[in-house]
Amino acid sequence: MVQAEKYVVMGGAGMLGRAIVRQLVERGHTVRVLDLVQPVEAFCETIIGDIRDPRAVEEACRGMDVVIQTAAAVWNVRTPRALYEQVNVDGNRLVIDTCLRLHVPRLVYTSSMDVVVDGRMPIVDGDESLPYPARMPPDAYSRSKIIAEKMMLAADSPALCTCVLRPVGMYGPHDKYHLGNVIGMARKGVSLRLGNGTARFSHAFSENVAHAHVLAAQKLAPGAVVCGQAYFICDHYPAENLFDFMEPFLRALDLPIPRRSIPYRLAYALAAFAEIVAPFSNFNRFAVIQTCVDHTFVDGKARRDLGYSPIVSREEAFLRSVQWLRSPQSM
């Protein structure tokens, strides 16, 4: 039986954070949430605050056994570039410093597969041996996540055991970005594919990624193999083209299936133009490359060190996601 502990989940009102909170509460742990908004579910104590705010972070971390840090400025058209640095770099630096000052012994950080994507070369069955890009990627989000991940790994010590999880393309209930972007465009009548449909992409359901975070938190201890390590987290089914992955969701919602496609080279040229006329848009060359070039990963290291295996099947993940997409919350 797992001993009950005290956890704070930063970003606990988000897609991943909600799933982590739910799993921790089900295991009998005491859970606190730090987020900009109040979670709909009244699972636990909530502190409304920002990870850039020293007082809010201190209040959240005080007396905790574990910090699970999922909060981030995510890749979105409305996110100012400066915010990535402020939240993903400065905010995480504050979290590390606060954990050390308050003697919080364990810290799990949610990174991203994007930290190894260089924007030029395809990745097929990538693992943790992949280096960071020799040149920083062109988008502010990926740059900030690389810096934050390096900070988190460097912070590992007997006083603060840290590890980093790198989810691949994550989806599930309350997904406003991965599923949300494609479904949102389809609801507005935009039905286009990018590329020739051969590029493959790895995915992970939010509950499975949450399970990996809980496992990582339990494994952290001075001298443990997981300390100072990064792990890719995937679902265990073959990678597929992004638009092929999205098609069953569109069908379930009676939305149009994209049949027209923009060739890769044309999409790349249009994205380069968009970077000039709409620099805050998510339609940029990096986004086109990620969609039109293979980005697949494996998680053998997480299986070995964390004992990770998905707890929700693809079929069940689809049903849960569609149920949420049909709800008023997703509109």
Model regions and ranges:
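Active-site Tyr-X1-5-Lys
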Residues: 136-163
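N-terminal Rossmann NAD(P)H-binding glycine-rich loop of SDR-like oxidoreductase domains
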Residues: 7-27
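Conserved Rossmann-fold NAD(P)-dependent oxidoreductase catalytic core, especially the SDR/UDP-sugar
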Residues: 94-141
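Mid/C-terminal beta-alpha module of Rossmann-like enzyme folds, strongest
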Residues: 219-282, 318-322, 331
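NAD(P)H-binding glycine-rich loop region in Rossmannoid oxidoreductase-like domains
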Residues: 40, 49-90, 98, 118
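Amphipathic terminal alpha-helices
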Residues: 6, 299-304, 309-331
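Substrate-positioning beta->alpha
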Residues: 143, 147-148, 175-181, 195-219, ...
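Conserved C-terminal active-site "lid" loop/helix of NAD(P)H-dependent oxidoreductases
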Residues: 206, 230, 270-309
